[in-house]
UniProtKB/Swiss-Prot annotation:
PROSITE patterns assigned: CYCLOTIDE (PS51052), CYCLOTIDE_MOEBIUS (PS60009)
Lineage: Eukaryota, Viridiplantae, Streptophyta, Embryophyta, Tracheophyta
Assigned protein family: Belongs to the cyclotide family. Moebius subfamily.
Keywords: Disulfide bond, Knottin, Plant defense
Cross-link (Cyclopeptide (Gly-Asn)), chain numbering: G1-N30
Name of this protein: Varv peptide B
GO biological process, one term: defense response
Keyword Disulfide bond: yes
Domain remarks in the Swiss-Prot or TrEMBL record: The presence of a 'disulfide through disulfide knot' structurally defines this protein as a knottin.
Length: 30
């Protein structure tokens, strides 16, 4: 399966591939 987008992104960047920092400050699938 795909990596889960669940990390926080207070700096505006997500480490998980295919994830965007939206809605801030949580990463979600883009």
């Amino acid at each position: 399966g795909l990596p889960v987008c669940g990390e926080t992104c207070f700096g505006g960047t997500c480490n998980t591939p295919g994830c965007s920092c939206d809605p801030w400050p949580m990463c979600s699938r883009n």
